Amino acid sequence: MRTFIKLILKILMFFISWIVLAILIPIPEGISDVWWRFTAELVPFLAIVILTYVFNRFEKDRLSIIHFEEPIKQTLTGMLLGLIWFYIPFLLLNSLGYFEITDRSQIHMLGIWVISAFINSIMQELLVRGYLYQLVKRKYNIWPASIVSTLLFTLMHGGAFEAGPIAVINVITMSILMTIILECSNSLVIPIIMHFIWNSLGGIIFGTVSLADDYPHLYNIEITGNPIISGGSFKMEGSIFVFIINIIMIGIAYYPVSY
């Protein structure tokens, strides 16, 4: 019981410290939208990096957080899995007429927007499956760690609750998938790359994934038809197709972990 209380206090201290740092570090005023978003993503990212380093320094045995064993292989694997993960439901919805590309927009400084999405992906994975995940896993095992990470990930995507049960289930299964990929690879690199591809392609290129409201998207897409299939207002992340793909990929990824 004492170990459990100590663990809960450490989790709360870490999470609250991250929120406080992210709020207290000011974002400059009077800058363009692209640089405002870049700074808004950079601040919580720096906060999580600093806290991860500081808290891990106080552990008797350092926790392995990212683990760059085969960075090139892991990056290429993450890119391949991320493309499969995104394009299968996207192409299905597009070919069946639920998504239709209507026109194309011009995005000023597209590269900075993409870098901002990358920073956001690293920040989320470090927060959800970094220090806290490894801490709970060491104290107990993978199952409590997975529950904690999934709860955090779901809370960070609270807009899903407004979109309906499928959107919530998709967020949960996405988190479970990323956790299994983490355990398969013993590294955060692949989940980070997959998360980034999902957000950059879905949020910035096609606009079928919900990011912060100020993120632009290159293509304008009209979403029509049954919201259970199309995703409705929550876009692709509210689609039953994404749930199916998540479950299939979870099953494939879980097999080597369980045996």
Predicted regions and their residues:
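Aromatic-anchored segments of alpha-helical transmembrane domains
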Residues: F15-I23, F86-L91, T150-G158, I197-I205, ...
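N-terminal, membrane-interfacial amphipathic/helix-forming hydrophobic leader that caps
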Residues: M1-R62, G203-Y259
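Hydrophobic alpha-helical transmembrane segments
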Residues: S17-S32, T52-L63, P89-L96, V114-A117, ...
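Membrane-embedded alpha-helical segments of multi-pass membrane proteins
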Residues: T39-I50, L110-I115, M123, L127, ...
